[in-house]
Design a protein with these regions (language model features):
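Condensing-enzyme catalytic core mediating Claisen C-C bond formation in acyl metabolism
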Residues: 30-34, 57-62, 245-323, 331-332
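Active-site-proximal alpha-helical scaffold in enzymes
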Residues: 106-119, 170-173, 178-181, 187-221, ...
């Protein structure tokens, strides 16, 4: 692409300049992943999580509280954090009146990712000007919100405590992380429903590519409990058929899928400019070569709760273009696939965007079969799983999918939906998320 400029149009061409924008694009900094952290229903650290996803271990359990509250769906995925573990990340003062599961999960995942990247937690007087965080969430401190409402309505405002604002403000998670790590670059929170985690990674990627930071801690988190999940239960989008068989409840791409299983957790990634990672001898998990976010505008078939297929396909194609990847180079897809009626449509959108069908379609899997739908945390938890697949050379299985939906089998081959772990070297993997509000995000990860 070239563009001609003249100094003065009235005087005619005095001088002409040709600017090759392709060269400018090639000057974008390469960005790699140097650290991972995970708090998931089936694994709190990388070792436990990797073991779980390789072996198809579910983190979905029956929840007595949901039964007591007469939820239709009485199963969910919730990370188990002991009091002892909390004290490894928070001091006694911080834990006083602390009741925010989302911030808890996010801080643990973030600090673990930071340490995994070989970075230190130093109490310096000066911030780390080269490092920042964009860490997303859908809500913050919903449990603290509930407590605060009761106290205010009971005329006990003075008993709210000094940390209620920090726990309930939308940016609470990034503020906690920024303070613990002394981050001096951008420290902010994004929120785009189920696309939040994927979007946070793309935002961090762009900041590094543009030379505004050397490294960014990106990811997302989601609160736990009935006050988050109740609205979805009321919408009848959660399964109610597996209260007695929790591990069988989350069934993406299955003919017997009956709705998603709510869950929670957090995923975190340290992403870094390649030059910086090489200079300090950091471990490199994979490279992020590009991505894209867009919206269907809630037009056409798009609504507040349903995606516009044209927008989804445009998002995938734009991500590939940004990454300079041909559709035929995609080895695997980590889908959004929630175990609802929209799974068929998602597969169709992938086939249209990639122009690949039948036996030519890449492998595709859904982490939600094991951990449920982590809402705002889903994109980041699934991205951690995607990166692990590239780094360790495997494709995790789709559990609860022994009866693949016939409409899906009309589009792609059965072998594209692995039921058992496959050991395979992966070069390029796509990760996509689609959320309420008709918003979409897609990332392209590549082996380094």
């Amino acid at each position: 692409m070239y563009r001609n400029f003249s100094r003065d149009g009235n005087l005619g061409y005095i001088k002409s300049f040709k600017i090759n924008f392709e060269i400018i694009l090639n000057l974008k900094k390469r960005v790699v992943i140097t650290g991972l952290g995970i708090v998931a229903p089936n694994g709190i650290d990388l070792d436990a999580f990797t073991h779980a996803i390789k072996n198809g271990i579910s983190g979905i359990e029956f929840q007595p509280e949901l039964e007591r509250l007469k939820f239709s769906c009485q199963i969910a995925g919730t990370p188990k954090i002991s009091e002892e573990m909390k004290r490894n990340y928070f001091n006694e003062l911080e834990l006083r009146s602390f009741n925010s599961s989302g911030i808890l999960y996010g801080v643990i995942a973030a600090i673990d990712a930071w340490k995994d990247a070989g970075l230190t937690l130093e109490n310096n007087n000066q911030p780390d000007w080269n490092s920042g965080t964009i860490f997303g969430t859908g809500t913050s401190g919903i449990e603290t919100f509930r407590e605060a409402i009761y106290k205010i309505d009971d005329f006990q405002t003075r008993r709210l405590g000094s940390t209620v604002v920090a726990q309930t403000m939308a940016s609470g998670i990034s503020a906690y992380i920024g303070g613990k790590l002394g981050l001096g670059n951008q420290v902010s929170t994004n929120s785009s429903a189920c696309t939040t985690g994927t979007e946070s990674i793309l935002l961090g990627l762009e900041r590094i590519q543009n030379g505004k930071a050397k490294r960014m801690l990106v990811g997302s988190t989601s609160d736990s409990g009935p006050y988050i999940w109740g609205g979805f239960d009321a919408m009848r989008v959660c399964t109610f058929k597996h209260n007695d068989t929790p591990e069988k409840g989350s069934r993406p791409m299955s003919a017997s899928a009956s709705g998603f299983v709510p869950s929670s957790g957090a995923g975190a990634l340290v992403i870094e400019e390649l030059e910086s990672a090489l200079e300090r001898g950091a471990k490199i998990y994979a490279e992020i070569t590009g991505g894209h976010v867009n919206s269907g505008g809630q037009r056409g078939e798009g609504t507040m709760t349903a995606p516009n297929p044209i927008a989804v396909q445009k998002c995938i194609r734009a991500a590939l273009e940004d990454a300079a990847i041909h559709p035929n180079e995609i080895d695997a897809i980590n889908g959004h696939l929630t175990a609802t009626t929209k799974d068929n449509l998602e597969i169709e959108n992938w086939t249209q965007a990639l122009q690949r069908k039948g036996t030519n379609f890449p492998y595709i899997n859904s982490l939600k079969s094991m951990i449920g739908h982590g809402l705002s945390a889903s994109g980041s938890m699934e991205s951690v799983a995607t990166v692990l697949q590239i780094y360790e050379g495997f494709i995790f299985p789709n559990i609860n999918c022994d009866d693949i939906h016939p409409n899906i089998l009309e589009l792609i081959g059965e072998n594209s939906i692995p039921q058992q772990m496959i050991k395979k070297s992966l070069n390029v993997v796509a990760k996509a998320s689609f959320g309420f509000g008709d918003v979409n995000g897609c990332l392209i990860f590549k082996k380094y």
